[in-house]
């Protein structure tokens, strides 16, 4: 088992406009990426659970050529709106860091 924080080269988030967030998880090499992909842990349902959005609202794409996964989903509060605690969306990857990968 490995935590995403230890297995991934990059785990980052940012706004995808004022109403959506995008999260990227990038691995060092094809072997690690393929092992993670084969587990099925990184999937729309994981992002739905971690970010409290319906799975059908999560756009999830593995990018084999970049050894990366990308997920885009609605923000719970629009960027800059009352109650927003991360106007740039750059701290929203934190819940992923402690996800266990059975690799």
Put a short name on every predicted segment.
Residues 1-103:
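Long, contiguous binding/interaction regions
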């Amino acid at each position: 088992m490995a935590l995403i924080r230890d297995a991934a080269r990059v785990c980052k988030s940012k706004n995808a406009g004022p109403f959506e967030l995008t999260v990227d998880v990038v691995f060092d090499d094809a072997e690690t990426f393929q092992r993670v992909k084969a587990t099925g842990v990184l999937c729309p349902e994981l992002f739905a659970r971690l970010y409290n959005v319906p799975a059908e609202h999560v756009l999830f794409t593995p990018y084999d050529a970049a050894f990366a996964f990308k997920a885009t989903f609605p923000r719970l509060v629009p960027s800059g709106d009352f109650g927003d605690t991360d106007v740039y969306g750059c701290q929203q990857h934190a819940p992923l860091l402690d996800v266990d990968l059975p690799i």
